[in-house]
From Swiss-Prot:
EC primary class: translocase
Protein name according to UniProt: Ion-translocating oxidoreductase complex subunit G
Function: Part of a membrane-bound complex that couples electron transfer with translocation of ions across the membrane.
Membrane topology listed for this record: Single-pass membrane protein
Alphabetical keyword list: Cell inner membrane, Cell membrane, Electron transport, Flavoprotein, FMN, Membrane, Phosphoprotein, Translocase, Transmembrane, Transmembrane helix, Transport
Length: 212
C-alpha cells in the first residue's frame, strides 16, 4: 500500500514537474515572439517618422535613455533613437507622454531633425474615446501629419495651440481635450530637444535593445 502511494506520489510529482517545464518553455517562446514583433513594429514606426534618405544606420540599434518630467510628461526614463549619417547625429526620435489625455496617458513618438523641425509624429498607445479622441491614430485620421514641418520658437509660441485656443492646429469635432494635450506634449518634447540637441545627437547608445 505504502509502495503504491509512494509510486503515485512520484508520478504526480514528475507530471507536475513536466507541466511546469512545458509552461516555462512556452512562456519563453511566446515572450521571444512578442519581443520580436515589438521590434519589428518599432522599426516600422521609426522609419515612418525619420526618412531613410537622411541616415545610414538602423535606428533601433542607437537607443539612448532620456528623462525629464517637466518636458516629457513622466518621471520615468524614456527611450530616444538617434539617426546618424557617417557617424554624425542628424535626427532623433523621442518618446514622450501626454499625461492629460481625456482618458489618461497618451504615449507619443516624435521625429525631429537637427534644426528642431518635426519630421513626423505617431501615437504609440492611448485609451482615448473611440470615434472621437482616437483620431490621434494615423489609421483613423491624418491629423498627426499636421505637425510635419513645424518648429517651436519658445514655450510661449502661440501657434502651438488648437485653433479653439488661438493656435494653428485643428482640434477634433466634438473633442478638444485630447488634441490639446497632444499638441502640448509634442511642443514640450520639441523644446526639450532644442535645449539638449548637441548632447543628445552625440550621445552613444546607452539603453538595451532586444533584437531577438
Amino acid at each position: 500500500m505504502k509502495k503504491s502511494m509512494l509510486k503515485n506520489g512520484l508520478l504526480l510529482g514528475l507530471f507536475a514537474l513536466l507541466c511546469t517545464g512545458l509552461v516555462a518553455i512556452v512562456n519563453q517562446l511566446t515572450y521571444a515572439k512578442i519581443k520580436q514583433q515589438e521590434q519589428i513594429e518599432l522599426s516600422r514606426v521609426l522609419h515612418q517618422i525619420i526618412p531613410d534618405e537622411i541616415h545610414d544606420n538602423e535606428l533601433t540599434e542607437h537607443c539612448i535613455t532620456i528623462q525629464d518630467s517637466d518636458f516629457l510628461g513622466t518621471t520615468q526614463p524614456l527611450p530616444a533613437y538617434i539617426a546618424t549619417r557617417n557617424g554624425d547625429g542628424v535626427a532623433i526620435a523621442i518618446e514622450t507622454v501626454a499625461p492629460d489625455g481625456y482618458n489618461g496617458n497618451i504615449k507619443i513618438i516624435i521625429g525631429l531633425n537637427k534644426a528642431g523641425e518635426v519630421l513626423g509624429v505617431r501615437t504609440l498607445s492611448h485609451q482615448e474615446t473611440p470615434g472621437l479622441g482616437d483620431k490621434i491614430e494615423l489609421r483613423k485620421s491624418d491629423w498627426v501629419t499636421k505637425f510635419n514641418g513645424l518648429t517651436v520658437s519658445s514655450e510661449k509660441d502661440k501657434r502651438w495651440h488648437v485653433k479653439k485656443d488661438g493656435g494653428q492646429i485643428d482640434q477634433f469635432t466634438g473633442a478638444t481635450i485630447t488634441p490639446r494635450a497632444y499638441v502640448n506634449a509634442v511642443k514640450l518634447a520639441t523644446l526639450y530637444f532644442n535645449e539638449h540637441k548637441q548632447k543628445l545627437l552625440s550621445a552613444p547608445a546607452s539603453c538595451e535593445v532586444d533584437n531577438e
